[in-house]
């Protein structure tokens, strides 16, 4: 064993060969090494020459351009084309090491700490990079907030999602300030009539039915009822029956209608006394000559059957002619506010288990929503609102003739039209449903609301059928504790991208 060569002798024979290798000659490997790439500065990028990572770079220092040596802006992605740089939201990275080079090191840690706090702030939501349309981007953002399953890393405040306009961005803040000031308002002062002016019902009566016992404080605070949601308030009834006297007639004017061509007055159901008509005729200061005035008692004026839009009801039929629709609508309808208040309303009404189930229904169509709206521009969204108003104008003519209780609502559940038969069936009149932000789920019982979200997720984005039926849909009446069992047939109207534009619900009562 002593004469055998050990391992050290074997290495001794090999090492001389390594010592003869020239270290100055690079050893070629099978895989070619890759050079590090750096973002060129604006000057080197303009000259199309190589640049280094440090700022200012050596080339700019030599040429005396160190003050202007900054990273060249990168080319925008296609989905960010047309969006100003000032409105783009700075990305939030989970890792400090992935911060942009142009951000200073001293404030990088502070901004990262603030962003981490924003992840725990309920007033911020996880958000995807902007769509081509602010309206579509805002609607997707609030949907992501509702289902609470977004894994993207951009965050913006909720109050910045409602609109691109400054006066709409702070709607929530203004509403909160107005609510605080409401306590100092003198309730003995006259009412502020913020409702439509073409109704005979006083604002006191309308808003007392809309908002309940706190109606005076809410109206006096000048809160926008179309941007802030207040649930409907059913009342107690000792007779346990609906009072259909709350239903106003179609002719809601306070004075009798007069048709000069036939020299005749039309009297509504509120004015049927002859002295009232004579006094109204004298006030009009009209010269009738030798003709005698005729009266049609309990006969509604033909003008009452003409469709008239209300421009103050932004979610409803706003205009009465197609020319007005195409000329006056110059901004898209924001579904974001409606989705936000719908989620707030559901949280107050249902438990956590029901909310998770409803959020799961909303999460099913979120990827389809992204695919359909990512390429839509602001002009596309304006065109969709024009289509909605134009379609609703035509449907209103048909709905007025069929005599079936019908309610029309948007994809966020916001009611935008009801006919007289639906008012009679449910007991809610048009002013109560359209004079504020009202959701279709507000007038449904709990089981019907659960079925509503399942049906909506089924037909809205997955099964592109034009109709669906809810076998049982129990409507809540203005009388607390009383419901009307119905069968509801849905008819869906879609826009050019396949998204649900409006839903028409025909309600037929189930007679036991």
Curated annotation (Swiss-Prot):
All residue ranges annotated as the PAS domain in the record: 391-463
Positions of the UniProt region annotated as Disordered: 95-118
Composition bias type Polar residues, residue spans: 97-106
Keyword Metal-binding: yes
One of the Pfam families matching this protein, by short name: Zn_clus
CDD domains listed in its UniProt record: PAS
A GO molecular-function annotation: zinc ion binding
Compartmental location: Nucleus
A Gene Ontology BP annotation from the UniProt entry: cellular response to starvation
Coiled coil: none
DNA-binding region residue numbers: 41-69
Keywords associated with the record: Activator, DNA-binding, Gluconeogenesis, Metal-binding, Nucleus, Transcription, Transcription regulation, Zinc
Gene Ontology cellular-component annotations: nucleus
Main function: Transcription factor which regulates nonfermentable carbon utilization. Activator of gluconeogenetic genes.
Name of protein: Transcription activator of gluconeogenesis
Organism: Zygosaccharomyces rouxii (strain ATCC 2623 / CBS 732 / NBRC 1130 / NCYC 568 / NRRL Y-229)
Gene: ERT1
């Amino acid at each position: 064993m002593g004469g055998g060569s050990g391992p050290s002798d074997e290495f001794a024979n090999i090492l001389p060969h390594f010592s003869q290798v020239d270290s100055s000659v690079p050893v070629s490997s099978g895989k070619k090494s890759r050079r590090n790439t750096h973002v060129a500065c604006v000057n080197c990028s303009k000259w199309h020459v190589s640049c280094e990572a440090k700022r200012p770079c050596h080339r700019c220092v030599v040429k005396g351009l160190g003050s202007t040596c900054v990273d060249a802006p990168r080319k925008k992605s296609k989905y960010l084309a047309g969006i100003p740089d000032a409105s783009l939201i700075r990305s939030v990275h989970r890792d400090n090491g992935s911060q942009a080079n142009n951000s200073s090191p001293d404030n990088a840690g502070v901004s990262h700490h603030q962003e981490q706090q924003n992840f725990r702030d309920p007033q911020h939501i996880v958000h995807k990079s902007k769509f081509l349309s602010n309206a579509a981007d805002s609607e997707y953002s609030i949907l992501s907030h509702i289902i609470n399953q977004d894994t993207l890393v951009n965050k913006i405040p909720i109050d910045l999602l409602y609109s691109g306009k400054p006066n709409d961005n702070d709607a929530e803040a203004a509403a909160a300030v107005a609510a605080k000031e409401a306590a100092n308002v003198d309730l003995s002062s006259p009412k502020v009539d913020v409702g439509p002016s073409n109704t005979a019902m006083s604002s006191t009566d309308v808003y007392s039915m809309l908002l309940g016992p706190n109606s005076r404080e809410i109206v006096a605070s000048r809160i926008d009822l179309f941007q802030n949601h207040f649930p409907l308030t059913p009342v107690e009834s000792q007779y346990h029956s609906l009072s259909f006297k709350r239903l106003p007639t179609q002719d809601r004017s306070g004075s009798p209608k007069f048709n000069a061509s036939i020299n005749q007055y039309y009297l509504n159901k509120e004015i049927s006394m002859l002295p009232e008509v004579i006094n109204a005729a004298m006030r009009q200061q009209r010269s009738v000559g030798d003709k005698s005035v005729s009266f049609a008692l309990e006969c509604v004026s033909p003008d009452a059957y003409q469709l008239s839009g209300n421009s103050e009801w932004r979610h409803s039929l706003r205009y009465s002619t197609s020319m007005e629709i195409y000329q006056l609508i110059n901004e898209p309808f924001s579904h974001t506010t409606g989705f936000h208040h719908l989620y707030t309303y559901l949280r107050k009404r249902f438990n956590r288990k029901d909310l998770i189930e409803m959020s799961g229904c909303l999460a099913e169509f979120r990827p389809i929503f992204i695919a359909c709206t990512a390429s839509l521009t602001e002009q596309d969204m304006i065109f969709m609102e024009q289509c909605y108003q134009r379609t609703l104008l035509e449907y209103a003519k048909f709905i007025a003739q069929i005599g079936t209780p019908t309610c029309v609502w948007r994809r966020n559940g916001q009611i935008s039209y009801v006919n007289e038969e639906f008012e009679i069936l449910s007991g809610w009149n048009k002013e109560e449903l359209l004079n504020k932000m009202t959701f279709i789920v507000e007038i449904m019982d709990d089981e019907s609301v659960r079925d509503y979200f399942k049906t909506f997720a089924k037909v809205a984005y997955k099964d592109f059928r034009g109709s669906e039926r809810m076998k049982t849909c129990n409507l809540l009446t203005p009388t607390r504790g009383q419901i009307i069992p119905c069968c509801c047939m849905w008819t869906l109207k879609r826009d050019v991208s396949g998204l649900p534009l409006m839903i028409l619900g025909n309600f037929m009562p189930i007679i036991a």
